[in-house]
């Protein structure tokens, strides 16, 4: 089992690396999901996520698609988009993923990994928003 600290990691790069690990059969736990980073212009990011939450089907609005508002679920959904979700292999891989806000008690004393290639310090122009800020904007709990 790999425990990855998402603090200061770019969400898309983190998601692609984690999706690869999941497809290889590893169990992955992500902690500090609210501290992951989405790069780009703040207003554009907020408008994109706000537009997603308003999507619905005109015939039956209860059918979806449903987009998350909590920060841990935003990270899970991003990783799900990089897996072959409609196949049995992709669904089994997705079940091996756990995402947490903060660090739970059972992982406090464990060794946390980070992904150096996905760190925000590698950006030349540091324009970004944390996943926690996006979740707060959408009305999520965390």
Swiss-Prot record:
GO terms for molecular function: mRNA binding; structural constituent of ribosome. GO terms for cellular component: cytosolic large ribosomal subunit. GO terms for biological process: negative regulation of translation; translation. The keyword Ribosomal protein applies. Keywords: Ribonucleoprotein, Ribosomal protein. InterPro entries: Ribosomal_uL13, Ribosomal_uL13_bac-type, Ribosomal_uL13_CS, Ribosomal_uL13_euk/arc, Ribosomal_uL13_sf. Part of the 50S ribosomal subunit. Belongs to the universal ribosomal protein uL13 family. NCBIfam families: L13_A_E (TIGR01077), PRK06394.1 (NF005004). This protein is one of the early assembly proteins of the 50S ribosomal subunit, although it is not seen to bind rRNA by itself. It is important during the early stages of 50S assembly. This is Large ribosomal subunit protein uL13. It comes from Pyrococcus abyssi (strain GE5 / Orsay).
């Amino acid at each position: 089992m790999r425990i990855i600290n998402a603090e200061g990691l770019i969400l898309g790069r983190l998601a692609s690396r984690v999706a690869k690990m999941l497809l290889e059969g590893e169990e992955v736990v992500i902690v500090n999901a609210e501290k992951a980073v989405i790069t780009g212009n703040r207003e554009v990011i907020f408008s994109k996520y706000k537009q997603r939450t308003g999507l619905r089907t005109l015939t039956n609005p209860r059918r979806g698609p449903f987009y998350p508002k909590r920060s841990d679920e935003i990270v899970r959904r991003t990783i799900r988009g990089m897996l072959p979700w409609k196949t049995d292999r992709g669904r089994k891989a997705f079940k091996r993923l756990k995402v947490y806000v903060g660090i739970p008690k059972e992982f406090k004393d464990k060794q946390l990994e980070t992904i150096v290639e996905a760190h925000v310090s590698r950006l030349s122009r540091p324009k970004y928003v944390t996943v926690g800020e996006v979740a707060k904007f959408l009305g999520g709990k965390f």
